[in-house]
Amino acid sequence: MSKHVYVFLAEGFEEIEARVAGRFDLVASNIPFGNFAIYDRAYSKGKDAAKREATRAIHNYFFVKGLDCLREGGLLAFITSRGVADSPTNAPIREYLMEHSRLVSALRLPDGMFSENAGTEVGSDLLILQKETGKGVQNEWEQLFTQSVSIESG
């Protein structure tokens, strides 16, 4: 019964068409990361500058497209590299995310969490967003999330 009521897709994210935009209550994944460009004609050739920019790095693309797939109030839960939250070059994407969603939670996961199973030492975060298109003012945590601040160690 549920397969007739709920959409379940197991295909490349870039292949998901506009027909499913705004249909999901939840988008969850341990997303790929890196500076790999994605070709998604609707994003690469579209009028939205943030969407065009997102196609230049696969992790940013997943966040922007993931939000597009959600219904209003839907949740996005992604495990991602720390670069999404930390890198100054990702500030425009974080700003876009905070303009289109509420920051529900941002958790820094323990170092080496995936080293045994995935063979990677990359630091990871769990980011949970709730879609809210056209929201007004960002709260204090959302404002902090969009900023990159250098911290001296030692």
Describe the role of every protein-language-model region:
Residues 1, 7-44, 60-70, 75-84:
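Conserved proline-anchored active-site loop of SAM-dependent methyltransferases
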Residues 2-3, 99:
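Short, structured coil segments at secondary-structure junctions
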Residues 13-16, 112-116:
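A short acidic, often aromatic-flanked loop/helix-cap motif at beta-alpha or helix-coil junctions
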Residues 32, 36, 111, 132:
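Flexible loop residues that form catalytic
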Residues 34-38, 86-88, 115-118, 136-139:
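Switch/connector loops and helix/strand junctions flanking conserved nucleotide-binding motifs
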Residues 42-52:
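A solvent-exposed, charged loop/short amphipathic helix patch at secondary-structure junctions
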Residues 52-115, 122-129:
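Conserved Class I SAM-dependent methyltransferase catalytic core
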Residues 116-154:
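Flexible, glycine-/basic-rich loop-and-beta segments that form/coincide
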